From Swiss-Prot:
Gene from which this protein is expressed: rsmB
Residues the entry annotates as binding S-adenosyl-L-methionine: C254, A255, A256, P257, G258, G259, K260, D277, D303, D322
Stored PROSITE patterns: NOL1_NOP2_SUN (PS01153), SAM_MT_RSMB_NOP (PS51686)
Pfam family, one: NusB
Designated name of the protein: Ribosomal RNA small subunit methyltransferase B
Length: 429
């Protein structure tokens, strides 16, 4: 039996690592969840994701409730108070329980002398909640986004930025990809129904199913046997444009964690697939995905800017370049992105994408297809990136996705309930 731990203090420390140290919640949370009982895993996740989703509101409230911010070794208490405020605002946890557990968290982080302070701040919020929220809702902080990102969204989408922000602040739906080599989508939906769950097929993407209510993967029919994979609908859209065929040599570049690698092999089981990623640690997840689905691909560690180092002079019939990006289209799924990214990252990422595109293009056969994809909503990484590439690359032609003046297809978060995603299909003349 696992030792009873204070979830509020664990959540506070996790959020602090994201905000103060720039660590990804995807790396921090799984080891923490291993330390708590199964029934507490979901609450720990909710507290971490919820605080990061609403961080600017919680910060704003603390600044109103406290004369001075907590600094230095007491900084964790700042995040513990955030966890307390989040529970009072957004969960159905009874207020007395939320207060008691949060105050006890001070002991877990070795700050028992601050229990009274935490209790006082949270009770003060309860007393002033109505007035504070009215003031907050009249401020720019209500958008729950850093100002640099808000400015970029307003500039890129003058008519739509508010709906993008609203979608980013929602909890994401759970999308699945049905492995067509095992089941048709309809037959798997029947199995899901038998398991007491409900799913809805996507109108455009033939393998995509949205769960009515998110569920643990082990509850999904045939998950361990590779019948189904968790993957957002928009990410599945890559296959619509790539259209892989049996017998072809296909490169999945920037492939980790392998969701698109395995989707290629589901659509074209006899394709020769090479999956490449720069991050050796994340490549282990590509192997895991291939193993669970019973598939084979050539997996290599390599830098997309220097393809000759890992594929020599080899050319491919099709290339999927899921480029490194700001991930501003998947904020609802990874709210820590709002606080990990900086404005200066965008031109740096655009430069990296440009270098990878130029380096990999010679490795596409004449007549071949390259699909450039990102999970970003920012034009610098998407339409402007492809426009510049077309202008400097004489043998590249845009196909089916937009126009040379406005190249690519941009999904916005919430549209069709998928994440924000960009695709451009290029043919080599």
């Amino acid at each position: 039996m696992k030792k009873q731990r204070n979830l509020r203090s664990m959540a506070a420390q996790a959020v602090e690592q994201v905000v103060e140290q720039g660590q990804s919640l995807s790396n921090i949370l799984p080891p923490l969840q291993q330390k708590v009982s199964d029934k507490d895993k979901a609450l720990l996740q909710e507290l971490c994701f919820g605080v990061l989703r609403t961080l600017s509101q919680l910060d704003w409230l603390i600044n109103k409730l406290m004369a001075r911010p907590m600094t230095g070794k007491q900084r964790t208490v700042h995040y513990l108070i955030m966890v307390g405020l989040y529970q009072l605002l957004y969960t159905r946890i009874p207020p007395h329980a939320a207060l008691a557990e949060t105050v006890e968290g001070a002991i877990a982080i070795k700050r028992p002398q601050l229990k009274g302070l935490i209790n006082g701040v949270l009770r003060q919020f309860q007393r002033q909640q109505e007035e504070l929220l009215a003031e907050f809702n009249a401020s720019d902080a209500r958008y729950l986004h850093p100002s640099w990102l808000l400015k970029r969204l307003q500039k890129a989408y003058p008519e739509q930025w508010q709906s993008i922000v609203e979608a980013n602040n929602q909890r994401p739906p759970m999308w699945l990809r049905i492995n067509r080599t095992h089941h048709s989508r309809d037959s798997w939906l029947a199995l899901l129904d038998e398991a007491g769950m409900k799913g809805f097929p996507h109108a455009d993407y033939p393998d995509a199913v949205r769960l009515e209510t998110p569920a643990p993967v082990h509850a999904l029919p045939g998950f361990e046997d590779g019948w189904v994979t968790v993957q957002d609908a928009s990410a599945q859209g890559c296959m619509t444009w790539l259209a892989p065929q049996n017998g072809e040599h296909i490169l999945d570049l920037c492939a980790a964690p392998g969701g698109k690698t395995t989707h290629i092999l589901e659509v074209a089981p006899e394709a020769q697939v090479v999956a490449v990623d720069i991050d050796e640690q994340r490549l282990s997840r590509v192997y895991d995905n291939l193993k669970r689905l019973g598939m084979k691909a050539t997996v290599k560690q390599g830098d997309g800017r220097y393809p000759s180092q890992w594929c020599g002079e080899q050319q491919f019939d099709r290339i999927l370049l899921d480029a490194p990006c700001s991930a501003t289209g998947v904020i609802r799924r990874h709210p820590d992105i709002k606080w990990l990214r900086r404005d200066r990252d965008i031109p740096e990422l655009a430069q990296l994408q440009s270098e990878i595109l130029d380096a990999i293009w010679p490795h596409l056969k004449t007549g071949g297809t390259l699909v450039y994809a990102t999970c970003s909503v920012l034009p610098e990484e998407n339409s402007l990136q492809i426009k510049a590439f077309l202008q400097r690359t004489a043998d590249a032609e845009l196909c089916e996705t937009g126009t040379p003046e406005q190249p690519g297809k941009q999904n916005l978060p919430g549209a069709e309930e998928g994440d924000g995603f960009f695709y451009a299909k290029l043919i080599k003349k």
